[in-house]
Amino acid sequence: MSEETVARTDEEKVQMYQAMLDGANVITSVLDANNEYGNDLTNVEKQAKVLRSAGYLEYGKALGDWGSEDFSAIDSAVTAAKAYTP
């Protein structure tokens, strides 16, 4: 995905980064069989949910105005979402 440059305030960046970490947590929680979150979903529904979240994370990361944020948890969640097969 190519970088997109946008004009955002530092507060907007902080809010989006936190939302992205929350999205990574959603992916991790849905894919964790020991976690009750998402256990009411079928495997196909789980896949759709994690891929939707991964798309949001990829979009956010592609914005070109990030500073020194650590994207390792986000990258790991995206990789896990893409690897999940029902």
Across the structure, where does each feature detected by a protein language model lie?
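Beta-rich interaction/scaffold domains
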Residues: 1-86
